[in-house]
Amino acid sequence: MRVAKEDVEIKLQLPGVVMRQHKNFGDVGGYGRISGEYFTLAAGVDTTPLFQGLEGNLCQCPHWGYVLSGRITTTDAGGLKESVSTNDLFYWPPGHNVHVDDDAEIVMFSPQHEHTEVIDHMIEKTR
């Protein structure tokens, strides 16, 4: 799910203040602890080979995040592609691959246990 900043409802606007809120932005029920993550990614990075061996050869961990800069495209198990870019909020459900279209910096929040397993798998793939 991609949400452009301009599409997030303004709840309060005062001189020097704009507060926006997008409700129902995913459900973390049953996941336990969440980790905060900051990623710096170069254009051309593709997670497909790193996710080989995971269930469905995809990341099965959901992520909620914000794109500080750049552009990233995810592809789900059905082949559906969705791109996020600078200032977008995003939710990536389980079952995705990632391709970095333009150099990007993102902040993500992910279920800690599940994403640590994916990161550990990726580390093993690079050895």
Model-derived segments and spans:
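Double-stranded beta-helix
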Residues: 3, 99-127
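Conserved hydrophobic/aromatic beta-strand scaffold that supports enzyme active sites
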Residues: 19, 36-38, 64, 81, ...
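Short histidine-centered beta-strand/loop micro-motifs
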Residues: 48-58, 76, 82
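Short, conserved beta-strand element in jelly-roll/cupin
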Residues: 56-74
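Well-ordered beta-strand positions
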Residues: 65-66, 91, 99
